[in-house]
């Protein structure tokens, strides 16, 4: 391990504090209730999406004080903020009413083909079909769609806290592994696919079919486990009630923008321009829109941007730690490390090392996506789902420990799929 600079040491300490803060947001929300005079600041500190942006700002202030204005600005400009920008844009577009209408119609049509309890079938599809769809529309888009539809259907009813946490745990894990059918949808795969020459055929053979099995098993298991509660829920809101009738032309235009943004996902100058045109279109045809989720998407982008800034100073300890592992150790090491850092950062650091075996590369990426549902910071789409669903939990917050416990069983299924199949 190389000797760290003072800035790197400070960044590591701030990173640890940010992770601790992430697991303490429930406490700040509690303080907001018992100290109403300062409720505003406690609510701010209780927003998970604010955590990494806040500590990233503190890091930049340290760099400014210790190294000067030039170094602080140079470091910021050296960071790549394409992913936060993309997640912001894709969340807003995928969360529009016409897109939700379209996906709801597809899910409903598929559910009607299955002669079983329609509530359970639709729930299963939201946790299985939509995450796998993420391989083609990107994981952030799939997370946004699944979370919004779950919020408007299941989470809008009087259901148990156990079902809520179990659903979020399976959703986060399935989104993380469900994007591995293609080389462009999952952030940890995207970071290495071009350099390691991984195409769709490679992904399907080494990841895709295993991930699909794990996604199906996880969705089926949680559906079966809570089957009695589904039967007792007071008329679970039918999925068709999520959507109003939207003209086909409007749906097609929204899909057109969604596809273009996905195609140009690596070119912010293009997809941000498309997004501005999209905002103009939604303003012109406001009667076919529900309010855009701009606030939620901006908070998620702020979270990811903070992670980019803080994560950029962690290479000095993280990369040697990974490289000292063998194939088996790196799989489980990456799964565990993903819980405390972004899985795309792990695979990116791995891609900087030359001479890795193909088995090591596969194990690193498989471990990174396997652990992607354990915490809110583990996978880039997680803050989007967190932001959308948290209002339906007690004190409008998803407890990080509750998420961790709920995500462990589906994570173990993913471990079995990638290591035993």
Region annotations inferred by a language model:
Residues 60-76, 90-109, 132-144, 312-320, ...:
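Transmembrane alpha-helix boundary signature
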Residues 121-177, 191, 348-366, 388-411, ...:
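Hydrophobic transmembrane alpha-helices that form the pore/transport pathway of multi-pass ion
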Residues 3, 7-32, 162-165, 169, ...:
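Juxtamembrane and boundary regions of transmembrane helices in multi-pass small-molecule transporters
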Residues 39, 225-250, 285-295:
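Flexible interhelical linker loops that connect adjacent transmembrane helices
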Residues 9-27, 47-65, 80-94, 145, ...:
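Hydrophobic mid-bilayer segments of alpha-helices in multi-pass membrane transport proteins
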Residues 1-9, 41-49, 70-85, 200-210, ...:
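Interfacial loop-to-helix junctions that mark the boundaries of transmembrane helices
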Residues 66-74, 100, 254-358:
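Transmembrane helical segments that form the transport core of multi-pass membrane transport proteins
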């Amino acid at each position: 391990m190389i000797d760290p600079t003072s800035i790197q040491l400070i960044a590591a300490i701030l990173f640890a504090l940010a992770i601790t803060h992430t697991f303490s947001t429930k406490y700040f929300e509690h303080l907001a209730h018992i100290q109403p005079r300062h409720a505003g600041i406690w609510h701010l500190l209780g927003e998970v999406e604010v955590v990494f942006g806040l500590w990233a700002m503190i890091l930049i202030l340290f760099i400014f004080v210790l190294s000067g204005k030039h170094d602080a600005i140079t470091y910021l400009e050296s960071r790549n903020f394409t992913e936060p920008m993309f997640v912001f844009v894709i969340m807003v577009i995928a969360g529009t009413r016409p897109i939700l209408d379209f996906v709801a119609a597809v899910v409903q049509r598929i559910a009607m083909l299955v002669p079983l309890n329609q509530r359970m079938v639709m729930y299963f599809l939201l946790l299985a079909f939509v995450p796998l769809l993420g391989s083609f529309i990107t994981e952030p888009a799939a997370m946004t769609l699944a979370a919004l539809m779950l919020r408007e259907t299941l989470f809008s009813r009087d259901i148990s806290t156990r079902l809520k946490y179990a659903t979020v745990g399976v959703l986060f894990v399935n989104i993380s592994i469900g994007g591995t059918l293609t080389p462009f949808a999952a952030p940890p795969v995207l970071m290495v696919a071009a350099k390691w020459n991984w195409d769709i055929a490679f992904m399907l053979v080494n990841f895709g079919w295993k991930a699909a099995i794990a996604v199906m098993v996880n969705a089926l298991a949680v559906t079966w486990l809570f089957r009695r509660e589904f039967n007792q829920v007071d008329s679970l809101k039918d999925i068709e009630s999520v959507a109003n009738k939207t003209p086909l032309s409007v749906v097609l235009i929204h899909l057109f923008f969604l596809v273009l943004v996905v195609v140009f996902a690596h070119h912010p100058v293009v997809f941000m321009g498309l997004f501005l045109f999209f905002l103009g279109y939604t303003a012109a045809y406001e009667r076919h829109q529900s309010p855009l989720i701009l606030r939620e998407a901006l908070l998620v982008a702020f979270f990811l941007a903070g992670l980019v800034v803080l994560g950029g100073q962690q290479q000095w300890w993280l990369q040697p730690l990974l490289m000292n592992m063998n194939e088996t150790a790196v799989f489980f090491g990456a799964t565990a490390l993903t819980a405390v850092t972004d899985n795309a950062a792990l695979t990116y650091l791995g891609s900087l090392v030359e001479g890795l075996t193909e088995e090591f590369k596969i194990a690193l990426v498989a471990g990174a996506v396997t652990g992607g549902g354990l915490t809110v910071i583990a996978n880039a789409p997680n803050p989007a789902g967190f932001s959308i669903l948290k209002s339906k939990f007690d004190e409008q917050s998803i407890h990080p420990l509750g998420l961790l416990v709920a995500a462990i069983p589906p994570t173990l299924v993913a471990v079995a799929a990638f290591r035993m199949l």
